[in-house]
Regions:
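Short pre-active-site segment immediately N-terminal to the catalytic Zn-binding motif
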Residues: 36-50, 76
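Active-site recognition of the HExxH zinc-binding catalytic motif
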Residues: 49-62, 86
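Catalytic zinc-binding patch centered on the HExxH motif and its immediate surroundings
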Residues: 3-33
Length: 174
């Protein structure tokens, strides 16, 4: 869990903080402050899912800086479209890494997508696919780097230490 969260923090385009949120929200992306805030003390899978959801918002829904290759800002998206995209990205990324968020994600997407027309939902599919792919690749690269750093640290810790005692010195009892 710690390595995965460290990888998420590294792929996030904005800083991530953990704190108590006074509203019902589990997290949020603040475009004006350029930061993500995640609710303290949630379970591991909820924390991961929320972090990925908010990173998706930071990549896709910052009006001044869309950060996904091949995605243009285009016309203004409704809040419901933004929520469907962010949660769908979170679900896809979490599923890839074996974290099942379907119970929460399906209800969340269904709630935000009700009343949407099929062409509007299809439009978001390419955005979801590209964003999830970019995040998965970034997370995998960061996890490899974290594991490489750990193995190098462990190798250094296991290097033999050679002590040389000079025979010319006298040691006095204390």
């Amino acid at each position: 869990f710690e390595d995965f969260m460290k990888a998420l923090e590294r792929v996030s385009p904005v800083p991530m903080e953990y704190m108590d949120i006074s509203s019902e929200a589990k997290g949020y992306f603040s475009p004006s402050e350029q930061r993500i805030v995640i609710q303290n003390d949630m379970g591991e899978s909820q924390t991961v899912k929320t972090a990925v959801h908010e990173i998706a918002h930071s990549l896709l829904h910052d009006k001044d800086n869309v950060r996904v290759e091949g995605i243009e800002e285009g016309e203004k998206k409704s809040r419901s479209t933004k929520e469907v995209e962010a949660e769908s990205v979170a679900y896809t990324v979490c599923q890839h890494f074996g974290i099942d968020t379907s119970e929460y994600s399906f209800a969340y997407v269904a709630g935000w997508s009700s009343g949407k027309e099929m062409p509007e939902l299809k439009e978001s599919m390419d955005t979801i696919r590209k964003t999830a792919s970019q995040l998965i690749t970034g997370i995998e690269n960061e996890l490899r780097e974290i594991q490489l750093q750990r193995s190098q640290t462990m190798e250094k810790a296991q290097e033999p230490v050679t002590l040389v005692v000079a025979e010319c010195c006298e040691y006095h009892a204390l």
